[in-house]
């Protein structure tokens, strides 16, 4: 059946459980959210949370076999230990501060994952494992910070924004995929690694560079670096059995 909660404080508090075989779950209001220990388990359903503070806080879980999960609002975020496991689904996070915070996990067999907003990023310990999916991160400060990992069998990874880059120990490892990083200072910093069997790697921006100890080992790939100072600095390596390597810009060079 359909389940609807509407009021100024439409929330599920401690120990609440909604279990149904088939249903539509709508939570709307000034503070429409699922708090600690909340569970909404259903075989098939659409889950919509809207409001000024529509978010899932610590230890939130929405398990479903098939479903569409939409979270919108001014502060739409997953806080610590947020988990959305599902067999098939579309996961959309939009808002001014649409991001995954500490220990966020989105695991599904097939899905489309879109995070948009002014500060759409993955912070420490973020993981998005999926068999097949499209991963899009857009915003003013779209970055992967330390220890970010996005393992997937097949996927397209797009990072764009003012400072779209991979910083220390950032890793994107997949079997097949297209990797696009664009923005003002688009670069791989110390320890940046992109490992893939097949892939197309495109880096565009004013400062699209590989800095010290950058490495991109692939079997087959197209590598394009464009920008005003598009170059490989010392210690940088691009190794591949077959590939097209294009470096363009005002100072497109490989340094010592």
Question: Residue spans of the language-model regions?
Answer:
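Intrinsically disordered, compositionally biased repeat/linker segments
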Residues: 1-256
